[in-house]
Amino acid sequence: MDGRTADSPLITAYRGGKPTRRPVWFMRQAGRSLPEYLKVREGVAMLDSCLRPELASEITLQPVRRHDVDAAIFFSDIVIPLKLAGVGVDIVPGVGPVLDKPVRTAEDVAALPQLTWEALEPIREAVRLTVAQLGKTPLIGFAGAPFTLAAYMVEGKPSRDHLGPRTMMHADPETWNALANWAADASGMFLRAQLEAGASAGQLFDSWAGSLGLADYKRFVAPASARALDHVRHLGAPLIHFGTGTSELLVAMRDVGVDVVGVDYRLPLDEANRRLGGTVPLQGNIDPALLSAPWAVLEAHVREVIKAGSFAPGHVLNLGHGVPPETDPDVLTRVVELIHSISPE
């Protein structure tokens, strides 16, 4: 944990304190919405851009320079730990992560290569380069949650309903647990590499957990998510847990042992806080769809989100999902200016 960021608005809010200004950052703030990103990425494959430390660092820094957000989020991809372990995976444009061979049997899981600490050196180097330039602005490390990683591995590609992993949990729980634990250790090591190299907080993204009911989540997923975070708890950095479509899972997601819960755009923050019993700071949850609405509509919505978030023990503004690629970057800058102009309670 970088001592220079301890008093930053972001870390203060994550710890339930009173920040000097309202902190805001955006999921997917680094990436396709920025012309400068498209320029440096030209001719470079997605996963290659994540593994070139200078390039990954530059992409991470771009939105901080442009928008004056209160945090950088490390530019990478949730399947990078798979690639670094030696699993055949690539990002296919217009599709997403595609594996050379799905993982569907006990033999498949037993044959998975193990991620090594040495393989993570490009990640550590990119983080070191980034924090050296960020100064007092915190860098958030991130990793995909084990369920989301394992879901990709079972399906072999993105899926709408995740029937494969959901069937495996019940049909072959032993194999499922072995796979979830493999994914937990890969994710946990990936996050640990970022935090040890200087990231100030860590976020676990469970993109696909919304396909699960609460009982399945608690039984088949939560233990693996807790295991992933066990790799980094000793470092003392604030930990955030976010999933999409997870309104019914928020309490269980908190209970894997995190400091902050991210809320997607579907659930108002005052209701999320009520469900969580006012126990943790919240992050979110501006609706990305409204970034393309008239400014008066977007401004009213942002103010509404701030009001709903004021009920929680702490609030970091964010979107309720990632920045859509077609977003006008000037709108994001204007949203940041608006949030910073509203004095903290």
Swiss-Prot record:
Molecular-function GO term, any one: uroporphyrinogen decarboxylase activity
GO BP, sorted A to Z: protoporphyrinogen IX biosynthetic process
InterPro entries in alphabetical order: UROD/MetE-like_sf, Uroporphyrinogen_deCO2ase_HemE, Uroporphyrinogen_deCOase
UniProt key word Lyase: yes
Catalytic activity: uroporphyrinogen III + 4 H(+) = coproporphyrinogen III + 4 CO2
Alphabetical list of PROSITE patterns matching this protein: UROD_1, UROD_2
Subcellular location: Cytoplasm
Residues under site feature: Transition state stabilizer: 77
Gene3D superfamilies registered for this protein in UniProt: 3.20.20.210
UniProt function note: Catalyzes the decarboxylation of four acetate groups of uroporphyrinogen-III to yield coproporphyrinogen-III.
Quaternary structure and partners: Homodimer.
Protein's UniProt name: Uroporphyrinogen decarboxylase
